[in-house]
């Protein structure tokens, strides 16, 4: 059970609402916390950052990167490894050039699971992402991009992304909604400290991605494994959870990229 104490100052500005579900909602509580921060508040719109959402388009996929550009769904942006193996036809690249991600952008999932925030590093460059993703191109003139990302990914930013100012749940986020989010205009020294930490984390993520790729190459080299093709993925589909567990022994010569999973050897 949740309890709280309110006064007339909380009731009068909110159309005389007295219901507990309103005053105890996270959006209202965190909103009060932000109001009490002793610094000027600024909306994302007033930071002069570019916020936009792509137009719906029909996707034409191709087999490899020779004929396509790496494609990311909204759920892919939060993965440690964004090499999904999906490529959008280069024939679409001109009309969809504005959807190609660049370094130091902020992207936000805006439907389904909404409010997941990602700061793009160099590994995201030259990837086309779904139209259903809010893109923020930060402007450091008033708010440093690292601080903006840190705020949006905090509970104070997440709450504004996923709930209305009256505490209602938001089912879909649009650019106007994001532009209306407010954040404290902290001193430049503090913003720089936060920005430095976010930039460092982005750099470390790049190193982690490179290390993961190197490890994969080493494994394939020493185990004499080849890369999986699209046909391999189609042939060796997901296992059935109703299948009984079994143990067996296989010779090293029987192992390759398509059979390294134990399920593919089971009978």
Please place each PLM-identified region on the residue numbering.
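Non-catalytic DNA-recognition/assembly elements of restriction-modification systems
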Residues: 1-58, 187-267
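Sequence-specific dsDNA recognition surfaces
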Residues: 41-60, 75-103
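Short, contiguous, well-structured surface segments enriched in hydrophobic/aromatic residues
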Residues: 44, 68-71
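Short, surface-exposed loop/turn microsegments at beta-strand edges and helix-strand junctions
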Residues: 61-69, 78-81, 85-87, 99-101, ...
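Short hydrophobic-aromatic micro-motifs
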Residues: 70-73, 101, 106-109
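A short beta-sheet element
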Residues: 97, 108-150
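A short glycine-rich beta-alpha junction/loop motif
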Residues: 126-134, 166-192
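Short, positively charged
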Residues: 145-174
């Amino acid at each position: 059970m949740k309890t709280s104490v309110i006064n007339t100052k909380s009731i009068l500005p909110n159309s005389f609402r007295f219901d507990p579900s309103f005053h105890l909602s996270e959006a209202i509580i965190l909103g009060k916390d932000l109001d009490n921060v002793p610094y000027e508040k600024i909306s994302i719109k007033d930071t002069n950052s570019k916020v936009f959402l792509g137009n719906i388009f029909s996707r034409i996929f191709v087999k490899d990167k020779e004929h396509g550009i790496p494609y990311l769904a909204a759920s892919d942006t939060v993965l440690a490894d964004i090499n999904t193996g999906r490529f959008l036809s280069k024939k679409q690249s001109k009309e969809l050039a504005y959807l190609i991600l660049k370094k130091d952008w902020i992207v936000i999932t805006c439907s389904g699971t909404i409010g997941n925030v990602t700061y793009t590093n160099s590994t995201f460059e030259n990837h086309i992402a779904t139209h259903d993703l809010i893109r923020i191109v930060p402007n450091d003139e008033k708010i440093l991009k690292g601080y903006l990302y840190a705020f949006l990914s905090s509970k104070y930013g997440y709450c504004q992304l996923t709930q209305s100012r009256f505490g209602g749940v938001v089912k879909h986020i649009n650019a106007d909604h994001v532009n209306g989010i407010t954040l404290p205009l902290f001193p430049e020294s503090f913003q720089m400290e936060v920005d430095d930490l976010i930039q460092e984390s982005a750099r470390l993520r790049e190193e982690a991605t490179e290390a993961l790729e190197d490890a994969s190459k080493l494994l394939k080299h020493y185990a004499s494994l080849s890369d999986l093709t699209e046909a391999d993925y189609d042939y060796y589909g997901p296992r059935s959870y109703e299948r009984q567990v079994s143990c067996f022994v296989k010779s090293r010569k029987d192992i390759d990229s398509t059979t390294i999973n134990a399920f593919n050897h089971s009978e």
